Amino acid sequence: MDGFSALFVPSEPSVPGSQSVVPTCTGAFVSGKTQAQTPIPGPPPTLPSSSSVEDNSRRPAAGPFYLLRELPGLSDLTASINLILHYNLEHSFSKFCGKKVKEKLSNFLPDLPGMIDTPGTPDNSSLRSLIEKPPICGNAFTPLTGALLTGFRLHTGPLPEQCRLMHIQPPKKKNKKHKQSRTQEPAPPETPSDSDHRKKKKKQREDDPERRKKKKDKKKKKSRHSPEHPGAGSSQSGLR
């Protein structure tokens, strides 16, 4: 019993430099004898600093961590739920999505003659009634011309006003830029001195002998090349 009690006795903290007593066991038998072990020399103990103690206390306990957020909770909304009814949007849905089309059929088909907005069954003016019950006539059918096709109607009569205006081509606008009328400054009145100066210049040009000679030479050249000149005709006959 002494041997078993020695195993479960709490060991006292060992003091550095002292001998430690370790129980030994051989096989299935335990002996209460103690062996003295030689102390192992180690580094001198260092006292923990206050900063290291504070850091260790601040550090969280090491453990496993994951990079996943928390999964969303279960919600009552599923694909089978009508969201318009769920959020009470029936009024706004009927306001924006349930509008009646105010545009008439004639707005989409303006080239068709006649009143196409009203059905043609009351007065038998529909195309189906014309096919099912063709009119009885003795004359053969003749192809309609282009002018007649434009005004073709099932009932004889004038075209409605809305169709008359369709075939009238509006006048084309002329893309001419409006010329801006520049304000012309009134010319200053001529003084008698200016008019006298211009007259003097004209007289000087006319009196210049060189200008007179040039004019005479030009007249001579013109008269030589003209067919009425007698010298030109004699020279041409001599060459022949």
Swiss-Prot record:
Pfam families: Med19. Residues 170-181, 212-224 have a biased composition (Basic residues). Disulfide bonds: none annotated. GO terms for biological process: positive regulation of transcription by RNA polymerase II. GO terms for molecular function: transcription coregulator activity. GO terms for cellular component: mediator complex. Keywords: Activator, Nucleus, Transcription, Transcription regulation. It is found in: Nucleus. It comes from the Eukaryota. Residues 32-58, 169-240 are annotated as: Disordered. Component of the Mediator complex, a coactivator involved in the regulated transcription of nearly all RNA polymerase II-dependent genes. Mediator functions as a bridge to convey information from gene-specific regulatory proteins to the basal RNA polymerase II transcription machinery. Mediator is recruited to promoters by direct interactions with regulatory proteins and serves as a scaffold for the assembly of a functional preinitiation complex with RNA polymerase II and the general transcription factors. Belongs to the Mediator complex subunit 19 family. Component of the Mediator complex. This is Mediator of RNA polymerase II transcription subunit 19. It comes from Xenopus laevis (African clawed frog).
